[in-house]
């Protein structure tokens, strides 16, 4: 099946999207994060229990307040199928790009840039925008650097249930003067 990226629509997330978001999280984590270099296996990734009702419910609650308060979620759709999403948060003193995930078969088509543009528009450029990315995810780091993010440092954070640590790079988007 040939995918036409011009048919991809970026939209605000709505209630009912939460199971699709969890599916995309699980699929992209399994495709991206296992690494012999840092000792993370597929089993380690699966230990996050992506499919739990607790995770689905947490996304449902986030979608309910999306755009109204300090959180925003947008999705990329190929017809009726959600193929990617982005979540951003307004914090005191700075803003944050919390997540940006696209199904592997849809990566490299400009969808990430469209989602990021939408999130940055919502956040505004009055405060720095930070993100954290797995330090071994060179494709994502390159994508963010092309967008204008710069590395600020390396953070070690326990992300997995089994106690394994996945090193992350923190990045910040330079503010552009008005």
Which residues make up each language-model segment?
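Acetyl-CoA-dependent GNAT
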Residues: 3, 8, 12-18, 22-105, ...
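C-terminal "cap" of GNAT-fold acetyltransferases
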Residues: 130-141, 145-147, 157-178
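Flexible, glycine- and charge-enriched loops at secondary-structure boundaries
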Residues: 52, 109, 164
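Conserved S-adenosyl-L-methionine
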Residues: 153-154
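Conserved glycine-rich acetyl-CoA-binding loop
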Residues: 81, 99-117, 134-142, 146-147
């Amino acid at each position: 099946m040939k995918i036409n990226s011009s048919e991809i629509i970026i939209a605000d997330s709505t209630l009912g999207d939460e199971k699709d978001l969890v599916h995309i999280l699980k699929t992209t984590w399994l495709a991206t994060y296992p690494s012999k270099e840092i000792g993370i296996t597929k089993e380690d990734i699966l230990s996050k229990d992506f499919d739990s009702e607790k995770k689905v419910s947490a996304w449902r609650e986030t979608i309910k307040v999306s755009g109204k308060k300090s959180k925003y979620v947008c999705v990329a759709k190929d017809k009726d199928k959600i193929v990617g999403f982005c979540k951003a948060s307004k914090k005191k003193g700075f803003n944050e790009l919390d997540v940006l995930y696209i199904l592997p078969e849809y990566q490299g088509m400009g969808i990430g840039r469209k989602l990021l543009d939408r999130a940055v528009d919502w956040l505004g450029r009055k405060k720095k925008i930070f993100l954290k990315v797995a330090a071994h995810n060179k494709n994502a780091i390159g994508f963010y650097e092309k967008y204008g993010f710069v590395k600020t440092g390396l953070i070690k954070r326990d992300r997995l249930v089994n106690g394994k640590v996945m090193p992350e790079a923190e990045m910040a988007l330079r503010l552009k003067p008005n």
